[in-house]
Amino acid sequence: MVVFDCRIMAFTATRRPKPPETRNMLNPLPAALVAASVALGGPESAEAPAPSAYVLNHTMKNIDGIDTDLAQFKGKVVLMVNVASECGYTQQYKGLQKLFAEKKDQGFVVLGFPANEFGGQEPGSNADIKAFCTGTFEVTFPMFSKISVKGANQHPLYKQIAAQPAPIGGDPKWNFTKFLIDKSGNVVNRYEPSTAPDDAKLRARIEELLAAK
């Protein structure tokens, strides 16, 4: 006759394997998957900050080589133009000077930045450029030393403007590209070289910015 030991059976019953713990079934995503989610723009990703539209935070050398802090023009409406002496648009100097003379007492200023990136049409020295624009067009608005407005040596001022969102951003396409800056020092409009200084829409926009508080 076989005799069962109830104590052994009871002990065996208590050693049944436990089910897997809940926490093991709910493991978090592997770090690699989280990183991929962030890289693809997941909720933990952070967008790069937009470049500042304030562009008067630069010190430039004027046409005579003297350091000029652009912050001095804050409070004015500014038209920035990359100029050249041997360009088909060079005659715009005349219109720019007329516009400046007409509105300077209202708080408007033109800033000229000579550049030689387009067709090598500004080959002269700063002294040559000054003699040309003052002698030929009687320019009295502020002129600055020659800089690079595009390419590997692009000046930080134009690099900052190029980084702006469309339709303002991007390198100048040619000489006499124009950027309009409001009284707060923010670049607000872009005009291509074909836009003449007496263009009705350009003038209306300048008037609008001059009237703003």
Segments from the language model and where they lie:
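Bacterial N-terminal signal peptides
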Residues: P30-A39
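Bacterial N-terminal signal peptides that target proteins for export
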Residues: T22-P30
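Amphipathic alpha-helical repeat scaffolds
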Residues: N62, N82-E86
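N-terminal "domain-start" segment that seeds a small globular fold
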Residues: A46-A71, P156
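Structural microenvironment flanking redox-active thiols in thiol-disulfide oxidoreductases
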Residues: Y89-H155
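Thiol-/selenol-based redox modules, centered on thioredoxin-like
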Residues: P156-K159, A163-K213
